[in-house]
Amino acid sequence: MADYYDLLGVGRDADADTLKRAYRSKARKYHPDINKEPGAEDRFKEIGRAYEVLSDPQTRARYDQFGEAGLGGAAGASDMGDMGGFADLFETFFQGFGGPGGAAAGRSGRRGPQQGDDLRYDLTIDFEQAVFGQEQEIKIPHLETCDTCGGSGAKAGSGPTTCGTCGGAGQVRRATRTPFGSFTQVAECPNCGGTGQVIADPCNACGGQGVRQVRKKLRINIPAGVDTGTRLRVSGEGNAGQRGGPSGDLYVFLTVKSHPRLRRDGLNILSTVNVSYLQAILGDTIEVETVDGDTVLEIPPGTQPGTVLTLANKGIPKLGNPVARGDQRVQVMVQLPTRLSDPERTLLEELAGHHSARGKQHHHHNSGLFARLFGQK
């Protein structure tokens, strides 16, 4: 599923009212009774799921930290009954037009502080790191507030001045005539970019941008139980904001390397072990590899090829609750010899004779079976 914030078309700092308005607008757009296009109903359900998760502070916090992996089925399908009125739809449609009743009426166009962009960092970790978690150092390139000008973008002793194009409003207005009447369209000032200010004497260190790109070392905590696709959020380590706005966040996307002998299946670990046919028949105690180190495994007498034995609590810790762990399931592979020595063959034929309930006839039958099995005549 797509990112929940993207589905609703809101930023990650959106408050409850913003989320609600966005949900109503999107839900109406994709409601199956209104939108008959293929895929509209699926998108309608996705939007409902996104709103249900993000409107609850606890599930939103888990989603922000771990993505969908952190939800663990905590939220179900959303009730779509509350569509709300048409006010938000009309507000969205008329946003940007002035005049009586227009959505832009009384709204300041000058840009204030803006939050910095979020950043993505892809990190590959070992299988054992994913199981037990670890603190790891990474280096990221990101924008930080310029320490020379303090983020103002201007040289020392100078500062921003009011934009002469928009008079400091950050917006310019343009009259448009339509069959429905005249409208005044409000657009961002092209000279100042909506800030209402221009910098006549820019800072040499940052070129008037107020930010500089640097490489920064971070130590991030990888929790136990993560998997490929898990997303970790590092608050405030994205790009620096503009005009005193807060920094964005850093999102670390994990990829887990495969293990040569162990394989993950949910919270369980799968592995195989080879035993001889005598160990399978008589039983034995062996050591097998686990993420906790070599562990003793009992092979019961009469173990059949393909039997799966369980090592309890040797699996993957549950993300967010590392005390709960899965199991390791060990499939027993019985190795048969391709050739037998004469004494081995004699002993096996004697065993086959004793085991047969039909005497000599069965003895000859089993003898032929061993010959075919081990390639001897």
UniProtKB/Swiss-Prot annotation:
Requisite cofactors: Zn(2+)
Gene Ontology annotations for the cellular component aspect, listed alphabetically: cytoplasm
The entry's keywords: Chaperone, Cytoplasm, DNA replication, Metal-binding, Repeat, Stress response, Zinc, Zinc-finger
Residue ranges of domain J in the record: 3-67
Compartments where found: Cytoplasm
PROSITE patterns linked to this entry: DNAJ_1, DNAJ_2, ZF_CR
Self-association and partners: Homodimer.
Free-text comment on this protein's domains from its UniProt entry: The J domain is necessary and sufficient to stimulate DnaK ATPase activity. Zinc center 1 plays an important role in the autonomous, DnaK-independent chaperone activity of DnaJ. Zinc center 2 is essential for interaction with DnaK and for DnaJ activity.
Protein's UniProt name: Chaperone protein DnaJ
Protein's organism: Parasynechococcus marenigrum (strain WH8102)
The gene coding this protein: dnaJ
